[in-house]
């Protein structure tokens, strides 16, 4: 822990919140951990630079309950790594599968809408939140949505290609809303697709252009 590193992470979260619903939840364990008290202190200091963003402090265990009982309360959450690892896996239950969730490890704030980064972009790491699944490797049944959405985050946050990112997200939303699913999220009445079939559908919608 260092004040500089906490401030960097919290500032990225404020920038994200400023471009979204202007609401930021900061999670900690300040009631039992000195590091939690430091986290909250630094978050309050950074908040002075973002008067337009509502900062809400919450203990991590309380947040764990509310993520399940009232997930719409949250938009942008900022917390330290060990708490974030736990809560991000918990949040995946809401979507029905870890195969639905992308992730981005950012070193700085994303470019605002309408601003492109250029060909080289900005270094960051994008990947699904799940790890490897060797037990289903080669069976063509994995959910590729998290991989597609990770690519969308890359276009949006490293390159500022917001329209292109929207095309990927809109294609996925269209397919899922029409009842096409991989087996991990499919119900009895849904059209069950393999990994490659889901990929072909997404690619087909994107190649046909925005509607």
Q: Can you describe what each PLM-predicted range is?
A:
Residues 1-61:
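Glycine-rich phosphate/diphosphate-binding loop of Rossmann-like nucleotide-binding domains
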Residues 3-7, 33, 138-145, 193:
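Short, conserved micro-motifs enriched in small and acidic residues
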Residues 5, 67-68, 97, 207:
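A domain-level signal for the structural core that forms small-molecule/cofactor-binding pockets
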Residues 11-14, 68, 203:
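Generic structural signal for well-ordered alpha-helical scaffold segments
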Residues 19-28, 50-58, 160-169, 177-188:
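Flexible, glycine/charged-enriched surface loops at secondary-structure junctions
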Residues 55-74:
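A structured beta-alpha segment of the ubiquitous adenosine-cofactor-binding alpha/beta core
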Residues 68-180:
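Glycine-rich phosphate/nucleotide-binding loop
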Residues 190-211:
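Phosphate-binding loop/pocket of nucleotide- and phosphate-handling active sites
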